[in-house]
Amino acid sequence: MNKHALIIGASGVIGSNLATHLLAQGWKVTGVSRGRTPVPAGCVSLQLDATDAAAVASGLAGIDASHVFFTAWARQENEKENIRVNGAMVANVLAALGQNGHAGHLRHAALVTGLKHYLGPFDAYGKGSVPVTPFREEQGRQDVENFYYEQEDRLFEAAEKYGFSWSVHRPHTIIGYALGNAMNMGLTLAVYANLCKANGQPFVFPGSSAQWNGLSDMTDAGQIARQLAWAADSPAAANQDFNIVNGDVFRWKWLWPRLAAYFGVEAAELPDTISPLAERMDGAAEQWRAIAAQHNLVEADVSRLASWWHTDADLGRPMEVMTDMSKSRKAGFLDYQDTPEAFFTLFDRLKAERVIPL
């Protein structure tokens, strides 16, 4: 049976890695983006604002997708706006595909959210009753406003109406190759380390003592791509929610010196108070332009590489955050990715692509 994937957010860190993975498996892939960053080679590119219902209906007319993957979100000023805008993205796309879905074309829709399902949104960390780690799918929703819940509800509603199966995927922080992405810790830390090296400064952990000392895990973009592909046609994954992480655990106080050693910078001890990157990177734009010119790098705009705010938010959490993968494994997804290796593989590629200095 032919497989045609429609990927919403195909130029992002998850969407681009998913597109590459599906293309290698022989899928037809249509990649939806706003056009600021190219989609992977081999994708049919569709520039579209998924928040615009009329544009979505027009742009997706005639698209006979068998599977749709939601891998993007649009950050707004507050959670009410996050709910309105990001819920509409899911609703608009599924409504536009609905008639095709009712006719039997659309078989499955996958939604990528994240661990804020358990923690609450960025501006409400810890306001609900945060579950005990490791987070498990049956722990359910927090009693706070959260755009993830709105997206899920729109997904469930459309699946019941049009008769396709669904899956929800909850990664931890993503490591993967993508430029111009709003949430990319691996690239952010690579840029930060190179700025430290250029300035002769130590590599200071920008987060909390809870994150430094507690157990943690992460999600490689290739790992979630493989789970999304597996869930697309696996009966055991139909109408299920799954956590998705690499499968190992670590402590930042163990990993941080290893990242520093890769870049040849000094790993500082944990400071007495949190030292957010956003407060220390005022001069980063000018400094990065100089580094890019000196090393002939492909991107001189640091804002397209580093997401200081997102890395601060993840590493500044006041609690331990880690995830249980038992449900996914019991259902048949057994893939594993070594986390330090994921970082170093990403850093090697960033050097090879001239994103960071050799």
Model feature map: region roles:
Residues 3-25:
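N-terminal Rossmann NAD(P)H-binding glycine-rich loop of SDR-like oxidoreductase domains
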Residues 37-40, 44-92:
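NAD(P)H-binding glycine-rich loop region in Rossmannoid oxidoreductase-like domains
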Residues 68, 88-147:
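Conserved Rossmann-fold NAD(P)-dependent oxidoreductase catalytic core, especially the SDR/UDP-sugar
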Residues 118-120, 143, 164-197, 205:
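Flexible, glycine-rich beta-alpha linker
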Residues 139-172:
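Active-site Tyr-X1-5-Lys
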Residues 162, 176-192, 222, 230-242, ...:
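Glycine/proline-rich active-site loop of Rossmann-fold NAD(P)-dependent oxidoreductases
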Residues 191-219:
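A conserved pocket-lining segment of Rossmann-fold NAD(P)-dependent short-chain dehydrogenase/reductase
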Residues 224-311, 316, 324-326, 330, ...:
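Mid/C-terminal beta-alpha module of Rossmann-like enzyme folds, strongest
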